[in-house]
UniProtKB/Swiss-Prot annotation:
One of its GO terms (cellular component) is Golgi membrane. It is a single-pass membrane protein. May function as a negative regulator of TGF-beta signaling and thereby inhibits activin-mediated mesoderm formation. It comes from Xenopus laevis. Residues 1-38 are lumenal. Residues 76-97, 201-222, 256-285 are annotated as: Disordered. The gene is pmepa1. GO terms for biological process: negative regulation of SMAD protein signal transduction; negative regulation of transforming growth factor beta receptor signaling pathway. This is Protein TMEPAI. Residues 60-285 are cytoplasmic. A motif (PPxY motif 1) lies at residues 155-158. One of its GO terms (molecular function) is R-SMAD binding. Residues 273-285 have a biased composition (Basic and acidic residues). The lineage of its organism: Eukaryota, Metazoa, Chordata, Craniata, Vertebrata. It is found in: Early endosome membrane; Golgi apparatus membrane. A motif (PPxY motif 2) lies at residues 226-229.
Length: 285
């Protein structure tokens, strides 16, 4: 029994030793894995921090350089303005009187830095040129909205960037037709006008040269200025003088009746004047 008990005890001790060694190995592997993971995490964190530091330093350097350049330009502009103002104040005093009574002439010689420097107003214009002007200025001064119209080289029904439609297309075409007319191809002789005013009613236009048809309306009134004496006499043949001399009594009554008509007042006055002159010239014959 004791032997058996001893064997059992030895076997148990062996099993316990084996289990201990296995547990120890497992714990070592786990600790090694954990330590490796932690090391990798630490390395990643350090790299990220270094990258962030580099980015921040680059940004700070960039803004520092831009701020320095801006301050330097501003200081240079102030110095130039001060130099120009001081030179402008000293400019009128070109000659000064010394203590000995000798007049000393001061000649202005520009410095090389002044020759190479750009005036301050040009710098201001250059900086203001790049400032945003639209739409702030337009809102401040309350300008109306811009309307893009044609440049006039397109046909009357404007097509393209034109956004303003003043009239209907048909109305615009009708206006274009009415505004552009062909010259008249028919003329009215002065004798036809006189006959129409005396006997009433318009006569058909003749082919002879005379007053244009556009200057003669439907009611027989001359719209333009009255014809001159030479024009009226030039159109009459010689036989018309004798024809006008014979009815000496009938023509005044006809002329007086025509004078009463308000529509033919302008034409009748010219007719009477021309006939009176014809009578005066026709009496010796």
């Amino acid at each position: 029994m004791h032997n058996l008990m001893g064997l059992n005890s030895t076997s148990e001790s062996i099993h316990s030793n084996v289990s201990c060694t296995c547990n120890c190995k497992r714990s070592l592997f786990q600790t090694m894995e954990i330590s490796e993971l932690e090391f990798v995490q630490i390395i990643i964190i350090v790299v990220v921090m270094m990258v962030m530091v580099v980015v921040i330093t680059c940004l700070l350097n960039h803004y520092k350089l831009s701020a320095r350049s801006f301050i330097h330009r501003h200081s240079q502009g102030r110095r130039r303005e001060e130099n120009l103002s001081s030179e402008g104040n000293l400019w009128p005093s070109e000659s000064t009187v010394s203590g000995n009574g000798i007049i000393e002439q001061h000649i202005y010689t520009p410095r090389p830095s002044d020759r190479l420097s750009v005036p301050s107003f040009l710098q201001r214009d250059r900086f203001n040129r790049f400032q945003p002007t639209y739409p702030y200025i337009q809102n401040e001064i309350d300008l109306p909205p811009t309307i893009s119209l044609s440049d006039g080289e397109e046909p009357p029904p404007y097509q393209g960037p034109c956004t303003l439609q003043l009239r209907d297309p048909e109305q615009q075409m009708e206006l274009n037709r009415e505004s552009v007319r062909a010259p008249p191809n028919r003329t009215i002789f002065d004798s036809d006008l006189i006959d129409s005013s005396v006997y009433g009613g318009p006569c058909p236009p003749s082919s002879n040269s005379g007053v244009s048809a556009t200057s003669y309306s439907s009611n027989g009134r001359m719209e333009g200025p009255p014809p001159t004496y030479n024009e009226v006499i030039g159109h009459y043949p010689r036989s018309s003088f004798y024809h006008c001399q014979q009815p000496n009594l009938a023509t005044p009554s006809i002329l007086e009746s025509n004078r009463l008509q308000p529509g033919n007042h302008g034409l009748d006055s010219t007719i009477t004047r021309s006939k009176d002159k014809d009578k005066q010239k026709g009496q010796p014959f």
